[in-house]
UniProtKB/Swiss-Prot annotation:
Gene3D superfamilies linked to this entry: 1.10.10.200, 3.30.70.980
Keyword Cytoplasm in annotation: yes
Keywords tagged on the record: Cytoplasm, DNA-binding, Transcription, Transcription regulation
SUPFAM superfamilies: YebC-like
GO annotation, biological process: regulation of DNA-templated transcription
Cystine crosslinks: none
Renumbered residue ranges of the record's region Disordered: 1-20
Transmembrane annotation, as ranges: none
Record family assignment: Belongs to the TACO1 family.
Chief location: cytoplasm
Protein name: Probable transcriptional regulatory protein Mpe_A1337
Organism: Methylibium petroleiphilum (strain ATCC BAA-1232 / LMG 22953 / PM1)
């Protein structure tokens, strides 16, 4: 296992999010608009919208702004139409990268993604070129030192598929995407608060990178995450500190 722990990865991500809070709001608004447009504005009937609104609340987005964007998506306000597009490619050392985007201009988006790969040492691939290396799942991450036994008891009873303790002590709960809300509710009811809770693409295997290669890979990932149309970036690199 490379020296860059999962806990360090989480802290890096949270630090990046704190630096660009405005961009986080923009991404969440896109998620709300797309979810509401696809499944309607009733959160009781639209789990994707529920999750997007939960993200908005966690990011301290005002309730009136959330409501405005739900209304915009469901026809009560005029708005932009977004398209969801996934790009796949290779980073340093052949590490796999997935970029999920929402865009109102796919020509602009693919040009920006391709430019980022080309400039920072990667290659944009074709549909399906790397996604088979990932599993779509719900993921909850608890800090090193958390009670693994208690987390395991609550999570498995709620329908989680697995609970894993990583080398650095991080406790990771995995579940099928449809079970995400049930597992999350059970953990919250038990007073177990994860540092990270999301439906994600989890790498099945990793590529270890260190030194200059790790730095170059981190730069590529940061540039891809900073693109205006990017919603999420997933990868299978283990970056050595």
């Amino acid at each position: 296992m490379a020296g860059h722990s999962k806990w360090a990865n989480i802290q890096h991500r949270k630090g990046r999010q704190d630096e660009k809070r405005g961009k986080i709001w923009t991404r969440i608004i896109r998620e709300i608009v797309v979810a509401a447009r696809a499944g309607g504005g009733d959160t009781a009937m639209n789990p994707r919208l529920r999750l997007a609104i939960d993200k908005a609340k966690a990011a301290n987005m005002p309730a009136d702004r959330i409501k405005y964007n739900v209304d915009k998506a469901t026809g009560n306000q005029e708005g932009v139409s977004y398209e969801e597009i996934r790009y796949e490619g290779y980073g340093i050392g052949g590490a796999a990268i997935i970029i999920d985007t929402m865009t109102d201009n796919r020509v602009r988006t693919v040009a920006e993604v391709r430019h980022a790969f080309s400039k920072y040492g990667g290659n944009l691939g074709t549909d399906g070129s790397v996604s088979f290396q990932f599993k779509h799942c719900g993921q909850f991450m608890f800090a090193p030192g958390s009670s693994e036994d208690r987390i395991m008891e609550v999570a498995l009873d709620a329908g989680a598929e697995d609970v894993v303790t990583d080398d650095d002590g991080t406790v990771e709960v995995l579940c099928a995407p449809p079970d995400f809300e049930a597992v999350q509710a059970a953990l919250q009811a038990a007073g177990l608060v994860p540092e990270l809770a999301e439906v994600t693409m989890r790498a099945e295997n990793t590529v270890a990178l260190d030194g200059e290669d790790a730095q170059r890979m981190q730069k590529l990932l940061d540039v891809l995450e900073d693109l205006d149309d990017t919603q999420a970036v997933f990868h299978n690199a283990e970056l050595d500190e």
